Amino acid sequence: METNILELRNISKQYDGKVVLKGINLNIKEGEFVTLLGPSGCGKTTTLRIIAGFEQPNSGELLFLGKDYLKTPVHKREVNTVFQNYALFPHLTVFDNIAYGLKVKRNKYDVIETEVKKFLQLVGLEGFEDKSVEQLSGGQRQRVALARALINKPRVLLLDEPMAALDVKLRKKMQAELKALQGEIGITFILVTHDQEEALTLSDRIIVMNDGAIQQVGTPAEIYNEPENLWTAQFIGDSNIISNAIFIKDNLVTIDGKKIVCVDRGFGENENQIDIIIRPEDIDIVPVGKGFFTGTVKRVNFKGVHWEIIVKCKERKYLIHSTDRVEEGDQVDISWNVEDIHVMWKEIDD
């Protein structure tokens, strides 16, 4: 995964004077699973459409294996797209939907038949050749759309929120199948989604986007555990944000007057232009006198795999995810491990 199959260089896009992409720079490696993650209107789908050739940027470059790709028409790009609604032909059978691209290219029937059977097996739909797509479930339709896209042997597969319409249980099943499929065929997948769990589950790398700009690029672990700014920290999962802490020196911060050891370095001395993030699952509830701060349990909600607990300390409330049950009104201490707090610079408004 060393070769850049796609390079976006300073890509900008406007619609009716509104800027939707603000100089996007991004390299995508061959064979990796990349997710463009962000809220509605962040520019992720526009980025995908520029890669596909459905949109042209107002400025910037798109390179495919080092060569200009903006002038390459859609049908000549080594890129295929699976859309959110799958865009299947309702009047055609499963076989004919999957075979469509090969028929357009005027492949011989025996070649088409062999390839369709191979990809039906790949997506687990053997025996479905003669079914109408209207007889299929949502998950089966998604598999047909994947097979139709992959049978043309693209170098890059673009996925525009293909699991958004599926129920939660089926979506998780399809996520596992999609990840396994990408690993088996080994081509580059680029997924667009607003679902953080989906991005964390599937991706080799995540590109977090907001307001037409890239906020952070990293592995799922880096994005979750080491957010680079407040927006990313709040968008990815639940967070406790401490905005009035002081970075005293390397490996030492002050939170609400208490000196606490951390692993972060390089923020100077007595620096207050920082935020600290602590994830709810990293906070432990311990007996009074054993932790950093004492507080009162204000709320306890059962979430299935954990309890969601609010503890009100003197200076602030903490959100905690714990498998240990406590009762509302209990007096407790809270604590965490040294590596569980993350320091980041405050965002400076333009």
Curated annotation (Swiss-Prot):
Reactions listed under catalytic activity: ATP + H2O + polyamine-[polyamine-binding protein]Side 1 = ADP + phosphate + polyamineSide 2 + [polyamine-binding protein]Side 1
Keywords from the UniProt entry: ATP-binding, Cell membrane, Membrane, Nucleotide-binding, Translocase, Transport
Matches recorded under InterPro entries: AAA+_ATPase, ABC_SmlMolc_Importer, ABC_transporter-like_ATP-bd, ABC_transporter-like_CS, Mo/tungstate-bd_C_term_dom, P-loop_NTPase, PotA-like, PotA_ATP-bd
A GO term for molecular function: ATP hydrolysis activity
TM region(s), chain numbering: none
SUPFAM superfamilies given in the database record: MOP-like, P-loop containing nucleoside triphosphate hydrolases
Membrane topology according to the record: Peripheral membrane protein
Cellular localisation: Cell membrane
Pfam families named in the record: ABC_tran, TOBE_2
GO cellular component: ATP-binding cassette (ABC) transporter complex
EC number: 7.6.2.11
Purpose of the protein: Part of the ABC transporter complex PotABCD involved in spermidine/putrescine import. Responsible for energy coupling to the transport system.
NCBIfam families noted in UniProt: MMSYN1_0197, potA
UniProt similarity note: Belongs to the ABC transporter superfamily. Spermidine/putrescine importer (TC 3.A.1.11.1) family.
Protein name: Spermidine/putrescine import ATP-binding protein PotA
Organism: Spiroplasma citri
